[in-house]
Amino acid sequence: MSDDRRNRNAILFLGPEEIKGLISMEEAVAAIEQGYREADEYPIGNAPRRRVHSPDGVRVSNFPGGIPGLGVIGSLTRAEMVSQEGENQSYPYREHPVYLLWNSKTAKLDGVMMGEIFDQRTGFTSIMAFRTGATTGVGVKALARPDAEIFGLFGAGGQAVNKILAINAVRDIEKVKVFSRNPENRIAFCERMGTMIDKEIVPVDTPEDVIKGSDVVISATNSNVPVFDGSLLEPGQHVVTVVGSNSALVEGGWLKSGRRENDDETVRRADVIVVNHRESVMQEKQAGLYDPIQQGIISFEDVHALGEVLTGSHPGRTGNDQITYHFNNNGTAAADMALAKIVFDRAREDGRGMEIDIPVPGTQ
């Protein structure tokens, strides 16, 4: 059905197959940059992530908020089974994420989207997968040195793929050095990524090799414990970690301590510390920064939001020798709604999805 035949009063339902391939990583980075900028300009438009757990390990995460400039307000909700395997977290089962999109001016429910789950099934066009990678890209663009071209990467899974795609969208890559615990996995990953973006992607043997000489150091793992020694960091580097778990995993007895990819030394040496959402650090007791704050290594006032850097209310990097640290601590609706609105509009224009005409609409 073409867009001009659509019933604009109906709710549009989109399934996973109907939203594939509708946004590029370059567009995702631009959309999320707008989302975080608007989140800083209008802070009551987004709320911290909230999570609840069942006794059997099912976790439901909700991300409420909106982007006034795009005319959307809503939420992303997803459920998954969470399991701990040694020093790593895994997900034996994940359900499709559900996006609800309301018109931020009229309160009309415009659409319901069921997102993709696994990158191996959907390729690398999953808007859920794009979110974390593209947010890293926004941080690299804003905080890494302008001449950054050598990248060190921990991890060789789906998160790592989208990290490389994101940095390729914002910087001219000369080389990416990759370390993961399994040599065969990292070799295969590098071969695959090298052909995907036609850049030099090389496996390395130690964490030290990842950090030495890199302009940007990125961790993209499911680790529960620090993956590198912060004393190895070099002046001028930009550092990114992504594990920002919630304290309920400890309170519920699944973990003995909070998950974190960074160590205290990384936090101690960072001249600039940026997160996606400040309140989540304290509300969820996210160990990567919550623990150093409790120990007095830094104060909460040392932690700034990514949106502050984008709007200029915080200067971000002010010198080439500074170590900047982006704790990509959790998803936010600022990112989710920015991506979802673009995908939703394009799907509707392309005639995708199923219209649901509710007999009893909302009232004025």
Label the model's feature ranges.
Residues M1-A129, D147, H304, A334-M337, ...:
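N-terminal ligand-binding/catalytic initiation module
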Residues H238, V242-P315:
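Rossmann-fold NAD(P)-binding glycine/threonine-rich loop
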Residues K212-G213, E234-P235, R269:
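Alpha-helix C-terminal capping/helix-to-coil transition sites in glycosyltransferase folds
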Residues I197-S214, S231:
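Short acidic low-complexity segments
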Residues A338-Q364:
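Phosphate-binding loop/pocket of nucleotide- and phosphate-handling active sites
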Residues N224-H238:
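Rossmann-fold NAD(P) dinucleotide-binding segment
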Residues M128-G152, G158-A169:
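Short internal alpha-helix immediately C-terminal to a glycine-rich phosphate-binding loop
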Residues A169-M196:
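NAD(P)-binding Rossmann-fold cofactor-contacting core
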